[in-house]
Design a protein with these regions (language model features):
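ADP-ribose/NAD+-binding catalytic cleft of ART/PARP-like enzymes
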Residues: 1-25, 50-54, 61-62
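Short linear motifs at secondary-structure transitions and domain/linker junctions
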Residues: 4-10, 28-34, 108-112
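Extended catalytic/binding region for NAD+/ADP-ribose chemistry, centered on the ART fold
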Residues: 21-46
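Conserved NAD+-utilizing ADP-ribose enzyme module
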Residues: 24-25, 45-52, 58-184
């Protein structure tokens, strides 16, 4: 059993695994993380909406689980999903793997522009911190998820987290520019 967190704009006691985007890193599903601090930093403020962190327990026993590391297999799976190709793991209950840092720091266009080789794009995706995402892809997985609580974040929390992300992004973009220069 692991504790997982979902950042969003509403309390979600029973997630819909078919609601998410098909072209997200790990395909369509309900995205969570086991890193509480990252969940708090990941969420963005949305005008007219509460900013909510939902907390759950996930029982992995009895589920078909695929785990990725930051490697070529992960890279190919993420890029396949980003290109909206058929999801080869659609029948897997839970997919666990790193978040592609371009998602966090808005550099996707450079990586998917076609101007980089796959090796160069992967090198760029591996810059920066490695945060895990845990994606529930089937109804069976959702049935193994137990809602524990939700918390509405206030403006002070959101501002503090925004500053942390800004600092991380600045360091990431500095390293990104350095690697881009090396690739030129």
């Amino acid at each position: 059993m692991i504790k997982v967190f979902h950042a969003g704009y509403e309390v979600i006691k029973e997630p819909d695994v078919f609601r998410g985007r098909k072209n997200a890193d790990l395909g369509q599903g309900f995205y969570t993380t086991d890193n509480r601090e990252f969940a708090y930093r990941w969420v963005r403020e949305k005008s007219g909406s509460d900013t909510v962190i939902n907390t759950y327990e996930l029982e992995l026993e009895g589920l078909k689980v695929k785990r990725f590391e930051r490697d070529e297999e992960w890279f190919r799976y993420v890029f396949s999903n980003r290109r909206s190709l058929p999801d080869e793991l659609a029948d897997t209950d839970v997919v666990i793997g790193p978040i592609a840092n371009d998602t966090i720091y808005n550099t996707l266009g450079i990586m998917t522009s076609g101007y980089l080789t796959d090796d160069e794009a992967m090198k760029l995706l591996c810059i920066g911190p490695c945060y895990q995402q845990i994606t529930l892809k089937t109804k069976k997985a959702a049935e193994h998820l137990k809602f524990l609580s939700s918390e509405v974040l206030g403006s002070a929390d959101l501002e503090k987290n925004r500053k942390i992300i800004e600092t991380e992004e600045k360091a990431y973009l500095t390293e990104f520019a350095k690697v881009m220069e090396e690739l030129s």
